[in-house]
């Protein structure tokens, strides 16, 4: 787990095109990593405490983790079909 230091969007590698949501996270062990925020819409901002899991995003260079939706400060995906 860690604290968001920056929440922003990046563009994927060719030939894909999107504005993928990612955040920079300072972990409790001192590492600073980039993590992908999955799902439609999110409530993360600077200083949000999030839980991350492994799993890279193939078309975003340097993104090797996913934020866990519905844990700590990260809300689950709103209006997601059950």
Swiss-Prot record:
GO BP annotations of the record are: translation
Q: Does the keyword Phosphoprotein apply?
A: no
The superkingdom of the source organism is Bacteria
Q: Name one GO molecular function term.
A: rRNA binding
For this record, the Gene Ontology CC terms, alphabetical, are: small ribosomal subunit
CDD domains with a match to the protein in the record = Ribosomal_S12 (cd03368)
Residue positions of the PTM 3-methylthioaspartic acid?
59
Q: State the UniProt keywords alphabetically.
A: Methylation, Ribonucleoprotein, Ribosomal protein, RNA-binding, rRNA-binding, tRNA-binding
Record carries keyword Ribonucleoprotein: yes
Q: Which InterPro entries match?
A: NA-bd_OB-fold, Ribosomal_uS12, Ribosomal_uS12_bac
According to the record's subunit comment, the protein's assembly and interactions are: Part of the 30S ribosomal subunit. Contacts proteins S8 and S17. May interact with IF1 in the 30S initiation complex.
> Hey, which family's this protein in?
Belongs to the universal ribosomal protein uS12 family.
The task this protein performs is described as: With S4 and S5 plays an important role in translational accuracy.
Q: Which NCBIfam families match?
A: rpsL_bact (TIGR00981)
What's the protein name?
Small ribosomal subunit protein uS12
């Amino acid at each position: 787990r860690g604290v968001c230091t920056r929440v922003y969007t990046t563009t994927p590698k060719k030939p894909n095109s999107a504005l993928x949501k990612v955040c920079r996270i300072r972990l409790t062990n001192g590492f600073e990593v980039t993590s992908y925020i999955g799902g439609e819409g999110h409530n993360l901002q600077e200083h949000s405490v999030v839980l991350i899991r492994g799993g890279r995003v193939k078309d975003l260079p340097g993104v090797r983790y996913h934020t866990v939706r519905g844990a700590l400060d990260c809300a689950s995906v709103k209006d997601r079909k059950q």
